[in-house]
Amino acid sequence: MKFADAMQCIGKESLCFHPELNVFVNYPVLIGCHIGYLVVIVLLYKFMKGRTAYVLKYPMMLYNTAQVALSLVMAINLGQFLVYGVFNLNGGFTGTIEYWIFVHYATKFLDMFDTYFIVLRKKEEQLSFLHIYHHVTIGFIWGLLLHHGVANGTAFFGAWINSAVHALMYFHYLYTSLGYTNPLKTYLTQLQMIQFALCILHAVLAVVAHSPIPKKWAVLQLCYHLTLLYLFMRFYRKGMRKLKRKAKV
């Protein structure tokens, strides 16, 4: 496997191994796509006003199946770098990591269909601030890392663990779309919070330890995952309170 000097890659302020993909991570694309996401939500809301909710059982089954498959492929291809240390803090940059992080970034735009399905099915109770915040920021941040040439080396960990968790999450969605109840749903939220806690630990280590990636990006990761952990903990507590009220009834 070909490794490159991390500092040379970072100095390019560009994808190091796949510069042909730079067009997909420039600022007009990053900003435009995420503004477009919000515009589509508003337009769909207006379209659905006065209309009956769509069922979308089979489109969602196909969508969730594709998401499980994509997430597994990304997790497997990025997981090979775990042998260089859990966080690969001092790892060299490779074309493989850069490519699969780009794929991971691209899937964040596919993930936006989670929101579109919610609006079309009129499941407004699922459309929380956490949901919108996550979808409008995660792709933008990965795009920033790619745009500045730092989505490589130790950055593999965030994409790997997110892909692994997403494989389980979309399998849950697929399973429940078939009409089954998943008794492990609560543990899935706990797993997501563990993911954020590990990403926070990863960011702290990247700040205090020697790592070729500039510390400002580790600080960005730290701050971002702190917000996600806080919001998910609020969501989890709210869900647990709701379960307790149902149990009393």
UniProtKB/Swiss-Prot annotation:
GO terms for molecular function: fatty acid elongase activity. Pathway: Lipid metabolism; polyunsaturated fatty acid biosynthesis. The active site is at H134 (nucleophile). It is found in: Membrane. It comes from the Eukaryota. It catalyses: an acyl-CoA + malonyl-CoA + H(+) = a 3-oxoacyl-CoA + CO2 + CoA. Its main location: membrane. A motif (HxxHH motif) lies at residues 131-135. One of its GO terms (cellular component) is endoplasmic reticulum membrane. Keywords: Fatty acid biosynthesis, Fatty acid metabolism, Lipid biosynthesis, Lipid metabolism, Membrane, Transferase, Transmembrane, Transmembrane helix. The chain crosses the membrane at residues 23-43, 68-88, 100-120, 138-158, 159-179, 193-213, 217-236. One of its GO terms (biological process) is very long-chain fatty acid biosynthetic process. It is a multi-pass membrane protein. Its EC number is 2.3.1.-. Involved in the synthesis of fatty acids. Elongates C20 polyunsaturated fatty acids (PUFAs) with a preference for n-6 PUFAs. This is Fatty acid elongase 5. It comes from Leishmania major. The lineage of its organism: Eukaryota, Discoba, Euglenozoa, Kinetoplastea, Metakinetoplastina.
